[in-house]
């Protein structure tokens, strides 16, 4: 006995309900027609979740190739709305191939297993509710009563089941046996053709209607409010028929009121549309009396009502059942739009406008409106609306993207992103926004990256390329095609020295730009030694980068030797900077001196010129500039041996080194422990010493300072220019507790901050100094000098806020400590003191400053003058004790800082205007050193005084302006009115003002030069020239040109333009651009200067070369116009030469050209482009290919010049001439494409055709000038250009060049944004006449064929018997183009107006048509009714539609007779070819189909000729009159169409 397995065991019984149920929709699937996509499915839980898969059977793992379904998702998914609960398993067939899975099935063993699985409790499954349909009855479900036929089992029911088979009669036979024998012979095709013609004729006769139009609009009645409400409630009730409601349509339901009533009463959509149509047709008939304008006005008003209705419903978001209301309103508006009951242009234009103006709270609803398929397709398929849609989406994305980073992503943002990605994928042309693309491209790329969509990312990249191609050149912008060297230069110039330099990141960034190590090292050395850059920081930054690259595996030695051998540094490089970089690398063992000496011996480079100052003698000079410390004895000996035969003597070098050491020992004996020795002032000229001596001196001084760290002396290391050793010395001395030494350390750090940042030592030294300052505070109170120096350093370096707070606290304590506890103000005790104005001793000043705690403005002014007078006496008498004066100024300021600033400003202005130069030179250094005045404040005061002097024509301040300017410029001379420490601090402030601040110092230099040169003195010219050509001014200008290329033009801002200033400014430019004088810019003509400037142009000298070009043109423009023309031609020739030599730097010179110069160069280049393409106008195509090859390359060069000089809009006459010329060129290209045939084959598509290259060049010119040209052009010029381009884009020869087609299409799109509506209509009519209505043309011009364009009414014209009458104006008006839409004529309601004209025409032809109603047939096929067919028997002749139809048996007999006749006609020509009349066929019609082949009689021929004279005109289907139900008479024609007009048409 076999035991039955228990229920619930594996492998037995029916599968569970969860296994057979189809899986639920994914979580992210949106329910259809739902307002809120985030709403969860409201179905029961049994339908929502997908059950987990059944665990695999025990004893064997579930293998991946098993054929059994492992989960519910593996079962087939059915599309039925309802599935049965349980599916019985199918038993396996014998010999099944699935035996390998049998082990997974539970086997029933004889005798039973003896073990049963424990029953498991589970959640009872809920029986799903069956699907219900209208009628409140379940589908195909009968409650069991036992009496149903399906409940009674029988043998037939068990075998065949239950099915509802239709009861049909058995067919007697099929037509195949009788037809096949006739069709397989030679006459089969002829027979089949005859049969098809007969079927078509019969089909058309049976489908033709005869009754005329009997449509009448339902009338409207004036009802009371209660009656109207009841009628509306009946309309909302589906059980009340429309036929009864149409008798009493209430009056007053129009516009927004009608829509609101439909919404409030929840009227079903079909009935709401019925009501809108009934009201609309009555309103149209009422407004017809006012003419066409009345119907147009009503149509626009109705559309505005729908828009206001939607807007009002959207504004109720969040109130009550707003979701249902918005859903209904949107569906109603969508149905009205689908029925074409709205002004499409106005409505589709309103939707993007609403999206653009909506707030973030309503963005989701407006996105939902836009996402309606009908709206989305029609908006995105038009350029005007699609562009507005794209801009709106991008603007909202720019607003919401920053918010997303701060909060969780919202549903509206996701919907927005999905809509934008859909637009990118389906309609990328809508995103052709060349003007705003740079603003939105980054956000769009970030979106694609976030979504991780590779295909969409490719579409965005392609879109970016298309927009970039359409972009006109942006003035003062960086070129996108910069070389790798230029990008490395930019990276090095843009380093922020105010923050620590991450040398690792900088080195990797440079390596990413240029991967070739030798090329990267050459680029770095070229930047470091360039004469167009200033500052010693370049040496140490380059050294650190080279060390880093050497650590990464680069051969630094090889790269340096290759660069030195190239001699590319000779023209613009400084050899001493290169040698100094090599010396630093020798110190760090990154450059092998021994290897270099071997290279010298192997190459024989020692036999060079005798003078080491020549560039060619660099191999020998290099070993005279390396440090000897650290070199082995063998290398030193070899170096001395190699230098014996040169101009450099090692013996003299050693003697000079000993002399310098002795002189320094005598000057600063304290460093060497000789504190008792009196120091002697010995002037040493370090500039004449070799690099080796200076480096050795630096190392020697560091060793001495390490032994005596209390010494304060840094000038010798600065003169040796060994700032790396100076950093080491500062690190040693920073451990001192001497406040004067620490103050000196702080000043030195501040002065060399940029260099120490490059070295990498600034932040460690600053931290060590801060720790030492904190240690001093715990022992004793810091002195004023240390606090002031450290405060200046902290303000510039910006360390942590705690250090600044400590310094501010200590300075406030110092003020309180120095204040004297006195009750009376200082003015009460100064009467006696100030009576003796002549006495100004130090004791009296000390007593004045200590006599009180407050001081008024007058008294402070007196004391300030007294302090200045005392300082002047000390200077005049030769006293060297100036330590007290900075402290006195500082104590005076502590009385009242605001009052002191006012007093000091008044005194400075008075002194400047009184030309008291000596007093200012004495007083300003201690005032700045004591932090009583910022040097930038004196700069502002000086500029203000000079401006007032120039305005009032007071020339006295001009005599001292240059000397006052020198107070602002750093120099090697120490201030004579302060101590050395204060002088160093003052020089630090000068350096900060000139090199690390803004460009105010550049403005001041230009203003001083202009004021001085405005004086009648001729001696000032040489003074200003020497000032502008000084090394200090040149260094300042170089520093600021890097960060602000326009600073040179700022120097000339506001100048009067006198010749003397231009001469001095030319001297400055010569010193900047040609410091060595090798170009001789001062001695050559302007044309030669331009050529020299183009030769000297590089990435580093670009701003200077641009300033030189501008200055040359500015100077020549003052002479005559011909000189400017000659210079323009010279520039063009220089640009052409640069292009031929592939020098992009020459083209970059044109970037910043402004004004008439750029216009002249651009106009010249434009003329050259047009002249180069003149061969396209000659008409003949002989030799056009060779001309195009030469022309295309030349045009590309000139196009580059045009883009670089793109500026203001050209004049009107130039615009018209260029527009006409471009139109002629495009017509010539179209002619060339047509005459040349094919331009290539698919095998050589990569090689562009010469004609296509010329086309691409002209397209670039149009893209840069087109918008400006079309704005002011006439309509005829606009239309001509657009038509010429549209002819090219549709030319068949360009199919092999899809990129060119895309380029032309993009240019057409951009140009279409700037043409008028009249031009659009004109172009649309031209395209309609060509019958080339395509989606591309509609997208560009926003003009589409009318919806009813396929409807063409054909009316025969029968010659009248009476004299001809003048034509009906209505009929003539209707004879327009078949694709002339209402939009083309700016007529919104034209369909309604045209319909009323049709009604008038129908009324004129109604009576004749009724008279011939029963004898009418198709005019084209009159031969079928006029004469019988000679080959067909009479019973097979085609009968008119009013004859009674034949029985099926008679039809079968007719078909058999037709087959016999077809066999007899097998030898005759086919009637399809010989008997088809040439009649006018309307679109969609078929013309003549068949007829007799005999010669027609004279009567028949005349009748056919008479029927050929027909007229066609469009038919506009009256959408308003297509009602669902009007009357109960089914025989009436209520389609609002006069069917008599279709007599000459086949369906």
From Swiss-Prot:
GO terms for biological process: positive regulation of transcription by RNA polymerase II. It is found in: Nucleus. Residues 1357-1369 have a biased composition (Pro residues). The keyword Hydrolase does not apply. Residues 1398-1413, 1446-1468 have a biased composition (Low complexity). Disulfide bonds: none annotated. Residues 1379-1390, 1469-1480, 1499-1509 have a biased composition (Polar residues). Residues 1-63, 1356-1509 are annotated as: Disordered. GO terms for molecular function: transcription coactivator activity. Keywords: Activator, Nucleus, Repressor, Transcription, Transcription regulation. GO terms for cellular component: mediator complex. The keyword Phosphoprotein does not apply. Its main location: nucleus. Component of the SRB8-11 complex, which itself associates with the Mediator complex. Component of the SRB8-11 complex. The SRB8-11 complex is a regulatory module of the Mediator complex which is itself involved in regulation of basal and activated RNA polymerase II-dependent transcription. The SRB8-11 complex may be involved in the transcriptional repression of a subset of genes regulated by Mediator. It may inhibit the association of the Mediator complex with RNA polymerase II to form the holoenzyme complex. Belongs to the Mediator complex subunit 12 family. This is Mediator of RNA polymerase II transcription subunit 12. It comes from Phaeosphaeria nodorum (strain SN15 / ATCC MYA-4574 / FGSC 10173) (Glume blotch fungus).
